[in-house]
Amino acid sequence: MVYVLLAPGFEESEAVVPTDLLRQAGLETALVSLSGPTVSGSHGITLCADLELSQVDLSNAEMLVLP
């Protein structure tokens, strides 16, 4: 599992582009919020997270993306 961690003020392109490419490659990828069900990036774009950090089991993480 690949987790893309989203904190308020994240760089949108650094989150969306890798997520898209990883999913196209067939890797299970989840957007993970550090601050609630939605997170706003540095340019005011809001994304809905697949999971909140409290729901994540990092022991099965193959990769972490930190935008």
Annotate each PLM feature.
Residues 1-67:
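Extended, subdomain-level signal for the structured scaffold at the beginning of enzyme domains
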